[in-house]
Amino acid sequence: LQSQSTKLAITSRAFYTEPFATFLEKLSNISGFESVLTMNTGAEAVETSIKAARRWGYFSKGIPEDNAEIIVANGNFHGRTTTIVSFSSDSSYKDGFGPFTPGFKTADYCGSCNCESIENCLSIESFEKKINKNTCAILVEPIQGEAGIRVPTEGWLTKLRELCDAKNILLILDEIQSGLGRTGKLFAFQHENIMPDGLILGKALGGALLPISAFLSSKEVMDHFKPGSHGSTFGGNPLASKVASKAIDLLFEDKLIENSKNMGEYFLSKLRQIDSKIVKEVRGKGLWIGVELNESEVNAKDLCLMLLNEGLLCKETHKTVIRFAPPLMISKKDLDWAIDKITKVFKTI
């Protein structure tokens, strides 16, 4: 950050800069995608994915102009722009912001269908029923964060991949929260060994220093963007690119992905051992864990404030879930300290 800021921080993306080129090559190599479009915020990257999917639908699939549809999942959170809140299922994100953008349908996320195995998952059936000749993409989170760390049944992404292949539609995964080591893999979709058609990244991509986001896809999808059809003043600027490149390096140099897996398994097991009447379920992957509470016993926000008084930061969602997302470099000693604080607070209720 300091080194690059003394050389060149911002310039038009019309000009070649070494930090930007290096970052694009690095991100392409680790992800397996041919093309990368950089933006600033996660919401911008989601908007970019929507534009890309629609163009692919019109120019590759032959969907009539202005008729493309994208299927999303209930409980989704993809950002706060007017287009994105248009397909939110949470009234607190959209009340008072209409009229809303058309072109989206909502299906059931796996987790809301309460299936015990992928063979009887009603979510896949729900998505299939929403597909028609104008469907260009399915856009989902591999794990839903704002919904309370909802982890789908194993095999769900594989089934979605098969459905998209069969129906000739794009599978776009929003890994703004789950990507870059958070779940114990570089990307959450790697838990099922599939490859999406599009990937959305943000948050950790900036190394907790600067905003930078990206939409990644194939040349077939990206080449539908022509000069003037998309752009960003600050997207991919040399300073953010340099920081993001270093953030990627540190993921591997410091073995943060392996640490996320190992410490996440330890943290999850310890949380599940807490004997408390207020805990309904503990779920998660890697260092991304949700503790769902019995609603009749306590409010999640109250518990978060109690934990804050103990020196531990966490975030509630929907009144019933506490989310834990510790740094990927966290140690067992730090987690033991946290578990002691969590146990203490839980047992006071």
Predicted regions span which residues?
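Conserved N-terminal phosphate-binding loop of PLP-dependent enzymes in the Aspartate aminotransferase
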Residues: 1-349
